[in-house]
């Protein structure tokens, strides 16, 4: 019996939500070779420095490290190669228009399997300033303290 791996994240870019303000997300397919998908299924993928660009009406994902498959020998490809993302034409046009603005980037947030296919959750993001990051952390900690106090009060 096959395990249900529906939308189970294989890799997440946790630092992205800290460093960027994400205002829109897109689900994209990713073109991988046979040994790459085997490595992805083993969760040997890092999204930390990844980003995407639109070139000639196609979206290309760069700087995403997929470790070589151990039993792949000659079929393994370069770990940091540029990979094509599969999106609709309307989505690509929208992304291209947004990326032409200043300070906007297109980053990978999560990789997961959906119906046996590898999907990448991509986000249009704007970089946060240091004071925004501190404010977010402060707000998070305050919410945690309030939740802790409510829990202690209800005991």
UniProtKB/Swiss-Prot annotation:
The primary site where this protein sits is cytoplasm
Which PROSITE patterns would you find in this protein's record?
SSRP
Q: Which GO terms describe its biological process?
A: trans-translation
Where on the tree of life does the source sit, at the highest rank? Bacteria
Location in or out of the cell: Cytoplasm
What GO annotations for molecular function exist for this entry? RNA binding
The Gene Ontology CC terms held by the record are: cytosol
Q: One of this protein's Pfam families, by short name?
A: SmpB
Q: Which key words are in the record?
A: Cytoplasm, RNA-binding
Which CDD domains does the entry mention?
SmpB (cd09294)
The Swiss-Prot or TrEMBL record describes its family as follows: Belongs to the SmpB family.
The function of this protein is:
Required for rescue of stalled ribosomes mediated by trans-translation. Binds to transfer-messenger RNA (tmRNA), required for stable association of tmRNA with ribosomes. tmRNA and SmpB together mimic tRNA shape, replacing the anticodon stem-loop with SmpB. tmRNA is encoded by the ssrA gene; the 2 termini fold to resemble tRNA(Ala) and it encodes a 'tag peptide', a short internal open reading frame. During trans-translation Ala-aminoacylated tmRNA acts like a tRNA, entering the A-site of stalled ribosomes, displacing the stalled mRNA.
* Protein known as: SsrA-binding protein
